[in-house]
A protein has these predicted regions:
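Interdomain hinge/linker elements that couple catalytic modules in large macromolecular machines
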Residues: 2-24, 187-352, 357-364, 371, ...
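N-terminal pre-P-loop "Q-motif" helix
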Residues: 27-43
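Conserved glycine(s) of the Walker
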Residues: 61
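Short glycine-rich substrate-engagement loop in P-loop NTPases that contacts/grips substrate
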Residues: 84-113
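The conserved Walker
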Residues: 58
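Short regulatory helix/loop adjacent to the ATP-binding pocket of P-loop NTPases
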Residues: 153-169, 181-186
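Structural recognition of the conserved hydrophobic beta-strand(s) that form the central parallel beta-sheet
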Residues: 144-150, 171
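A cross-kingdom feature that marks ATP-driven nucleic-acid transaction machinery
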Residues: 1-29, 47-50, 55, 64-65, ...
Length: 486
C-alpha cells in the first residue's frame, strides 16, 4: 500500500496539516479547555510518560486542543519543524503505516536524533494501530506524544498490554456548565465571591441567600446550555437549532456508521442509529433489553452488544443499581443516559422552548446532572450507581460510593417539600450513613437551603440544578489543574 504514494506526495499532505513549518499561523479559538494546562504540562515537564491519550466524544474539542498546543509551542520558541500534527483519519494516512509516515517526517523534515512533539489525532484510525502504538511506547526515539481517540480502543489495549508509567490518559467530556460559562465570558464567580460546594452545608440562611443571588444570572443561560452548550462548536451559537442537523449527521454517520462499522464490524448500523435515537428519547430510564429486542425483532445479546458499542464511542453511559453498601445487584437492569444533554437534544432537534414541558425538562436536567457528577468524580476510584426503593416509593438518581461515606444526588419533584422519617430517600441516607445529600430541583424556584433530621447523620441541601452544575463543573476544573493521571 505504501507504494501507492511517493514520499513527496505524503510530504505535501503533511505540509498542509502543519502550516507552522512554513512560518504560517493556524487559526484556532482563543478559549482553552480546562485540560489544556495538563496537556501542556505533559509536553514540557521532564520525565513525563511517553504518550498522553485523550479519549472522548467527537466534537468535544480534542482536535482544536492539539492545534492550540502546536501553535503555542511554536510561539514560545519551539522549533516549528519539531512539532508534527497528524490527522490519522485522513484517507492517505489511514492507508500508510504510522512508522512509514514518521520515517518520511524524519528524513525530510526533522532528524530522529532531535526531540520532537507528535500530536496524533484519531490515532485508532492508523493502519495496524496496536503495533504502531507499541512501537511509539518502546521504540528508540525522543518523542513526546499526545494522541486522541473518539472510540475507546487504544486505552483498553494500553491497560492490558503495557507497563504503567509509559502512558497516561485523560477523559475529555463535553463542556461542563462552568466551562460553557467561561467560554462565553459569563463566570459570576471569577472574583472568588462564591464558596466551594461542600461549604454550602455549613452556611447560614443569609450566606446561602448571598450565594443564590450571586449565581442568579446563570438562570438565563442554563436552557441554552442544556440544549446546545455541551459542545464547543455549538456553545457560542445564538441559535443551536442551526447546528442540529449538522451535528446529527456527524454523530449518526461519522460515529455510528464509520467508526463502529470499521472498528467493531457491526453488521447493521441502522439498528445502532435506531437504538441511539431511542436512548435519546428515554435518557436516564431503566433500559429493558428484552423488551427493546422484542420490539425490534433482534436478539437480546445483539441489543446488549450495541449498547456497549455506543458506550465505547462515548455516546451513552450505563449506571447500574446498587444493593446495601453499594454492592452489586444480580440480574441488574441499568439506567442508560446519553453522555451529555446536548448529544441527546441535537438529534431530537430540541430547543430551549421545549424545556417548558415538565417531563422533558426533567429528562434533560437528569442527563446534565449525571454528566456533571461523573465528570466531578472521573479521576478517582468512586463508583456511581442509582438506587430504587424495593416497594417503588422512591429512587435516587446517583449515589457516589468511595473510600469514605457515600454522597447522594437526586432530582426531586419539589425540593421545598418537607422530608422526614418514612421518606425513602431519608431512610436510605440513614441506613447507608450518607455524608451529604443533594436534593436537586429541575426548575429555578427553590432557594438554597439545608435540612437535618434527628438520628440521621446526613446533611440535606436543597439546590437548583443550574447551581449544582455550576459548582460541580468548577470542582471538575480544579481537579484537572493537578495534571493527567495514569
Amino acid at each position: 500500500m505504501s507504494n501507492l504514494f511517493s514520499p513527496a506526495e505524503v510530504l505535501r499532505v503533511l505540509n498542509g496539516f502543519n502550516p507552522w513549518w512554513a512560518h504560517r499561523r493556524v487559526t484556532v479559538p482563543e478559549f482553552r479547555r480546562t485540560i489544556y494546562d495538563a496537556c501542556r504540562k505533559h509536553l514540557t515537564q521532564e520525565h513525563a510518560e511517553t504518550v498522553l491519550l485523550l479519549s472522548g466524544i467527537r466534537g468535544a474539542g480534542t482536535s482544536t486542543l492539539l492545534l492550540q498546543l502546536a501553535q503555542d509551542l511554536v510561539a514560545s520558541g519551539t522549533d516549528p519543524r519539531s512539532v508534527l500534527y497528524l490527522s490519522v483519519e485522513h484517507p492517505m494516512f489511514g492507508m500508510l503505516p504510522l512508522a512509514e509516515i514518521l520515517r518520511i517526517y524524519r528524513e525530510m523534515i526533522h532528524p530522529l536524533d532531535r526531540h520532537a512533539v507528535l500530536l496524533l489525532d484519531e490515532l485508532h484510525y492508523a493502519k495496524e494501530w496496536d503495533s504502531q502504538v507499541k512501537e511509539l511506547l518502546y521504540g528508540d526515539n525522543d518523542y513526546r506524544i499526545i494522541a486522541t481517540e473518539s472510540v475507546q480502543m487504544i486505552e483498553r489495549a494500553l491497560v492490558t498490554e503495557t507497563q504503567v508509567g509509559r502512558w497516561a490518559s485523560i477523559a475529555v467530556p463535553s463542556l461542563s456548565f462552568y466551562e460553557y460559562l467561561k467560554l462565553r465570558g459569563l463566570d459570576p464567580g471569577a472574583d472568588g465571591a462564591t464558596p466551594e460546594l461542600e461549604d454550602l452545608f455549613t452556611m447560614k440562611e443569609d450566606g446561602l441567600a448571598a450565594v443564590a443571588g450571586a449565581l442568579k444570572p446563570l438562570v438565563a443561560h442554563f436552557p441554552h446550555y442544556l440544549t446546545g452548550g455541551g459542545l464547543p462548536g455549538l456553545a457560542t451559537a445564538a441559535d443551536t437549532s442551526a447546528g442540529s442537523s449538522l451535528f446529527h449527521e456527524d454523530a449518526a454517520e461519522r460515529i455510528l456508521r464509520r467508526a463502529i462499522a470499521r472498528h467493531f464490524a457491526a453488521r447493521n448500523v441502522e439498528d445502532l442509529k435506531r437504538l441511539f435515537l431511542y436512548l435519546c428519547v428515554h435518557s436516564g430510564e431503566i433500559f429493558r433489553v428484552q423488551r427493546y429486542a422484542q420490539a425490534l425483532g433482534v436478539s437480546p445479546s445483539t441489543v446488549a452488544n450495541h449498547v456497549e458499542l455506543l458506550e465505547r464511542c462515548f455516546l451513552v453511559r450505563r449506571v447500574p443499581p446498587s444493593g446495601p453498601g453499594g454492592t452489586d445487584v444480580q440480574k441488574a437492569r441499568n439506567r442508560v443516559f446519553v453522555a451529555d444533554a446536548t448529544l441527546r437534544n441535537m438529534p431530537l432537534l430540541r430547543d430551549p422552548e421545549g424545556l417548558g414541558d415538565p417531563e422533558e425538562r426533567r429528562t434533560v436536567v437528569a442527563t446534565a446532572m449525571l454528566r456533571h457528577v461523573a465528570g466531578r468524580y472521573a479521576r478517582g476510584l468512586e463508583r456511581i450507581t442509582y438506587w430504587r426503593d424495593a416497594r417503588g416509593r422512591g429512587e435516587i438518581d446517583a449515589v457516589v460510593w468511595g473510600d469514605g461515606r457515600p454522597v447522594v444526588f437526586t432530582l426531586t419533584a419539589d425540593s421545598i417539600k418537607p422530608f422526614g422519617f418514612g421518606d425513602p430517600v431519608v431512610d436510605f441516607c440513614r441506613r447507608e450513613k450518607v455524608a451529604r445529600a443533594y436534593l436537586v430541583s429541575s426548575d429555578n424556584r427553590p432557594a438554597l437551603g439545608v435540612a437535618r433530621f434527628p438520628g440521621v447523620e446526613t446533611s440535606f441541601l436543597r439546590i437548583p440544578a443550574h447551581v449544582l452544575c455550576y459548582f460541580l463543573g468548577r470542582a471538575e476544573c480544579e481537579v484537572w489543574k493537578s495534571g493527567p493521571a495514569a
